[in-house]
């Protein structure tokens, strides 16, 4: 039983090596300044639509205070 489990584990590791999994070190660093720019009301037209109470189609489904426009 144990040898079958070992063979199965070996085959799985050969077909899907652990190096194929993304690691946190491979991801770009989170830049707080870029996030602030993304939500700037002057650059994002969604804020103006939200003031009117109307959002474009894909966003109006997930946002409770918006009507679809």
Swiss-Prot record:
Could you tell me in which tissues this protein is expressed? Answer: Expressed by the venom duct.
Residue stretches in coiled coil: none
Please state the protein's primary subcellular location.
secreted
Instruction: Answer whether the UniProt record assigns the keyword Signal to this protein.
Output: yes
**UniProt KW keywords:** Cleavage on pair of basic residues, Disulfide bond, Secreted, Signal, Toxin
Spell out the InterPro entries in the cross-references: Conotoxin (IPR004214)
Q: What is this protein called?
A: Conotoxin reg3.6
Q: Which Pfam families match?
A: Conotoxin (PF02950)
Provide a Gene Ontology MF annotation, just one: ion channel inhibitor activity
Q: What protein family does this chain belong to? A: Belongs to the conotoxin M superfamily.
Cystine bridges: which residues?
Answer: 54-68, 55-66, 60-69
Maturation-removed propeptide residues? 21-52
Where is this chain's protein located in or outside the cell? Secreted
* CC terms in the record's Gene Ontology section: extracellular region
How far does the signal peptide extend, from start to end residue? Answer: 1-20
Q: Which domain of life is it from?
A: Eukaryota
Q: Domain description from the entry?
A: The cysteine framework is III (CC-C-C-CC). Classified in the M-1 branch, since 1 residue stands between the fourth and the fifth cysteine residues.
